[in-house]
């Protein structure tokens, strides 16, 4: 395999656990780089109800949301998450929303041969925007996954999978598909 396009979590939660064990492991042979094209698909949301009438509870909610989203100090959630210290030392280092946090964090992974993954992820954040999002994205992604799954399981050939995908998108969403 030459490489994969994917979200930051692909490294820790998909590739690494499936890289083999012992002498058959490819751990340490992997690296990551900034993409030549951007990728963005939503994100994680944190919401709070606007009708909290108890001032003390409202302040706690405010402080919690600030800690999760905006606190870039070493005591903030994103810093602890990025550095693998959320539940004490030795946790999984992970990409976080804050480029500020990643820029000052240690993203070195043994799986990546000691590479600091944040050196690739921080510049890649410039590509993350929602300008290409549409109301059709989830439906199109589902149709694509279904077509690829049929092809991967040998149920259809490549051309049929592509044609089925186009038909599904056109029929389901009423879109013109070339």
Residues covered by each model-derived region:
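Sec/Tat-exported extracytoplasmic proteins
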Residues: 8, 14-18, 68-72, 148, ...
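Non-transmembrane alpha-helical segments in soluble domains
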Residues: 49, 61-73, 77-79, 145-152, ...
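Solvent-exposed, acidic/flexible segments
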Residues: 37-38, 54-61, 133-141, 154-158, ...
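Long, aromatic- and glycine/proline-rich binding clefts that accommodate carbohydrate-like moieties
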Residues: 79-146, 150
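Charged/polar, low-hydrophobicity segments characteristic of intrinsically disordered regions
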Residues: 78-81, 174-178
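Extracytoplasmic/periplasmic substrate-binding proteins
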Residues: 1-63
């Amino acid at each position: 395999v030459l490489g994969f396009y994917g979200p930051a979590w692909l490294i820790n939660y998909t590739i690494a656990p499936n890289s083999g064990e012992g002498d058959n492991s490819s751990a340490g042979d992997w690296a990551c780089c900034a993409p030549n094209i951007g990728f963005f698909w939503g994100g994680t949301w944190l919401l709070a109800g606007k009708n909290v009438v108890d001032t003390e509870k409202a302040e706690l909610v405010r402080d919690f949301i600030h800690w999760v989203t905006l606190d870039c100090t070493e005591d903030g959630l994103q810093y602890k998450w990025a550095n693998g210290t959320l539940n004490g030392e030795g946790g999984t280092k992970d990409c976080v929303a804050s480029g500020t946090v990643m820029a000052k964090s240690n993203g070195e992974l043994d799986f990546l041969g000691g590479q600091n993954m944040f050196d690739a992820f921080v510049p890649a954040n410039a590509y993350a925007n929602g300008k290409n999002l549409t109301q059709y994205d989830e439906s199109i992604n589902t149709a694509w996954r279904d077509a690829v799954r049929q092809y991967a399981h040998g149920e259809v050939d490549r051309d049929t999978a592509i044609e089925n995908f186009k038909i599904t998108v056109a029929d389901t969403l009423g879109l013109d598909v070339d």
